[in-house]
UniProtKB/Swiss-Prot annotation:
The PX domain mediates interaction with membranes enriched in phosphatidylinositol 3-phosphate. Widely expressed. Belongs to the sorting nexin family. SMART domains: MIT (SM00745), PX (SM00312). Pfam families: MIT, PX. A 1,2-diacyl-sn-glycero-3-phospho-(1D-myo-inositol-3-phosphate) binds at residues 51, 53, 87, 96. The lineage of its organism: Eukaryota, Metazoa, Chordata, Craniata, Vertebrata. The modification Phosphoserine is found at residues 201, 227. This is Sorting nexin-15. The modification Omega-N-methylarginine is found at residue 105. Homodimer. Interacts with SNX1, SNX2 and SNX4.
Length: 342
């Protein structure tokens, strides 16, 4: 795939038409338009329906990527917080719709975001269409000259097998099955090859929902500094998993399965404990640069390990502790390292 593909289109995103899914949550129509720079009439369109948790996951993924780009001149857009009460009110639905639309439009001028695998995955399953061509076809097609009899018309029995087969093909539209050409069309719209802007960032797959708010600077609650017992809590988390808060990631919105088979303590917890223990020692000794790196490494290990953790309760605990460690790392950067030369 050519690296120039990322410059071939102008992108335009809209989020509209909120509706209630049969399962009870709200979903939004997301439309991505790709307008060719060479031919403005060459417009491709992808439409998908997404819920709040999908947008929130994408926000966390893109926030992580944006932070690694070190683009300090632009502020990554905020996203509405999850809430238990009032999430079906018109004002909340509109706030979420606008937040999702602002997020997508923010990516337009940043190649590392608008060509990211996370954004491509977000639109996976949507059909790539050419709305202008469909509109032109509607004007040039002549009206049918002979009315088609209904399917239960007794005259159908008098048709020859070949005629019946041809008539049924006209009456029953056949949806094209997922095919490689459709996937290739999506690949052409989202050029996921590495760009110069993102070349310094380590390669990683899309974040899971468990990683959602941890790298999102707008999703952490303000509060007191982390407790000095963080490491002890992390080391004993497998014992306390039954007592951890198990509130759902999107309150009242998703169906989660509980897994009671925890098994032995995951290795990633032990590794993260060692890293964060050393980070606490470095911070106490005034070695703030080493402490900052230690917290970041510890959080990275937690986020890599938590998706495969068999205990949902422990996953929630890991997410909360990782958020605290990341917040502590940001405090060290702000209080002790912000004045250092680049």
């Amino acid at each position: 795939m050519s690296r120039q593909a990322k410059d071939d289109f102008l992108r335009h995103y809209t989020v509209s038409d909120p509706r209630t899914h049969p399962k009870g949550y709200t979903e939004y129509k997301v439309t991505a338009q790709f307008i060719s720079k060479k031919d403005p009439e060459d417009v491709k369109e992808v439409v998908v329906w997404k819920r709040y948790s999908d947008f929130r996951k994408l926000h966390g993924d893109l926030a992580y990527t944006h932070r690694n780009l070190f683009r300090r001149l632009e502020e990554f857009p905020a996203f509405p917080r999850a809430q238990v009460f009032g999430r079906f009110e018109a004002s909340v639905i509109e706030e979420r719709r606008k937040g999702a639309e602002d997020l997508l439009r923010f990516t337009v001028h940043i190649p590392a975001l608008n060509n990211s695998p996370q954004l491509k995955e977000f639109f996976r399953g949507g059909e790539v269409t050419r709305p202008l061509e469909v509109s032109r076809d509607l004007h040039i097609l002549p009206p049918p000259l002979i009315p088609t009899p209904p399917p239960d018309d007794p005259r159908l029995s008098q048709l020859l097998p070949a005629e019946r087969r041809g008539l049924e093909e006209l009456e029953v539209p056949v949806d094209p099955p997922p095919s490689s050409p459709a996937q290739e069309a999506l690949d052409l719209l989202f050029n996921c090859e590495s760009t110069e802007e993102a070349s310094g960032s380590p390669a990683r797959g899309p974040l899971t929902e468990a990683e959602l708010a941890l790298f999102d600077p707008f999703s952490k609650e303000e509060g007191a500094a982390p407790s000095p017992t963080h490491v002890a809590e992390l080391a004993t988390m497998e014992v306390e998993s039954a007592r951890l808060d198990q509130e759902p990631w999107e309150p009242g919105g998703q169906e989660e399965e509980e897994d009671g088979e925890g098994g032995p303590t995951p290795a990633y917890l032990s590794q993260a404990t060692e890293l964060i223990t050393q980070a606490l020692r470095d911070e106490k000794a005034g070695a703030y640069a080493a402490a900052l790196q230690g917290y970041r490494d510890g959080v990275h290990v937690l986020l890599q390990g938590v998706p495969s953790d068999p205990l949902p309760a422990r996953q929630e605990g890991v997410k909360k502790k990782a958020a605290e460690y990341l917040k502590r790392a940001e405090e060290i950067l702000r209080l002790h390292l912000s004045q250092l030369p680049p």
